[in-house]
Amino acid sequence: MTAPLRRRGPRPLPLHLILGASRGMAAIASAAMPRLPDGSPSWSSAWPGLNGAAPRISPAGLAEARRIGAALAAANQPAEAFQAAVIRRLLRADRALLAGIAAYRRHPYMRTLADPPVIWAEGGSRLLDYASGAPGTPVLFVPSLINRAEVLDLMPGRSLLRHLAAQGQRPLLLDWGWPGEAERGFNLTDYIAGRLERALAALPGKVVLAGYCMGGLLALAAAQRRPDRVAALALLATPWDFHAEDADRARTAAALLPGLEPVLAATGTLPVDAIQTLFAGIDPFGIPQKFRAFARLDPASERAAQFVALEDWLNDGVPLAAPVAREALGGWYGANAPARGAWRVAGAAVDPAALAMPSFIAMPARDRIVPPASARALAERLRAPTLHVAAAGHIGMAAGSRAEAALWRPLLTWLRRL
């Protein structure tokens, strides 16, 4: 008997199905087209209405096509047979993608970790205490606003927060929650100078502030504003120079903002599926590929459960308050305001060089969301930070199979030296 569907992802599903099938469709279309002298498909001959605006194969693609053509000629093999084999291979990949998505959506895994005690709450936000009564300086973790906070407490054996608690630290987590009516009007100043600072005020004495991804920028600004409450600062996979490695891609994301305005105005948020679509542009074919690989896993294996746990977190996103979406897309990605010294919170410029407290920068070596150069630019602005290059990716550093070696232990070592 077929198990019932349990989840909706990967989101947005139509986009990922189209991306997954696009290679096969392009191969079929290319095989039917007339050829140009250089061996590339004549898109304009097949569709005259394109009037020269059709895509052309890159020089690297043409070189590979010529290499394959020469190899086929040397082996006296017809190009048509090779094309047919490629199309069959791509169609099998499409079937594997569908199988992987179906296996994910029916997988029995469910997150069962119980939440730790809530010691403060405001609106939809909660402050969770993972080691109440533990000695030493509390470590307050600030996650991104666009994902659930659970990535730092994913599942047994994959929880940075529970690992630190087991090692004698007192980690706390600011769970931003779902933006309600009040939060939909929040801008970044409201989140930082308002809610985050009030969470700090709920704790006795100074804390170590630790921000992950977008949360690192929020933590940085709060630390600059409240050095009386922040003893040290840890920034994990935190961007600073949004134009460091691919300014065109950042500007392209910002250029989408006018088209998103009707949705922002109507809902007061940037919806989850819109956010997921923006992230899909970073690696359009990566998501279909990982679901093809998932189709080959034993559903009862630990690897399968870990895959599902991460995908559940990724697909259970949180909409972004419209004012924050405008600041992030237009100000951060479009204008590169942080790196230019133009990002302001409550009227004051955010400047890492103004911080005198100890700092720790964790820069993933393989990060497509926050390129290493973007995070390194932040380290270069801080006063003598401890820079740790994590041998992992953006999410893997926090909750992957190598997270303990890549981030958890180095962060713990730094905390113990404070």
Language-model-derived ranges and their functions:
Residues 210-219:
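Gly/Ala-rich beta-loop-alpha elbow adjacent to hydrolase catalytic centers
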Residues 369-372, 392-406:
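Catalytic histidine-centered segment of alpha/beta-hydrolase-like enzymes
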Residues 2-73, 204-205, 218-323:
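Alpha/beta-hydrolase-fold enzymes
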Residues 357, 371-380:
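Short alpha-helix in the alpha/beta-hydrolase fold that links the catalytic acid
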Residues 185-202:
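Alpha/beta-hydrolase active-site loop
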Residues 104-105, 112-180:
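Short, surface-exposed "cap/lid" segments of acyl-processing enzymes
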Residues 355, 361-363, 367:
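Short beta-strand/loop motif that positions the catalytic acidic residue
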Residues 379-396:
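Catalytic histidine neighborhood in serine/cysteine hydrolases
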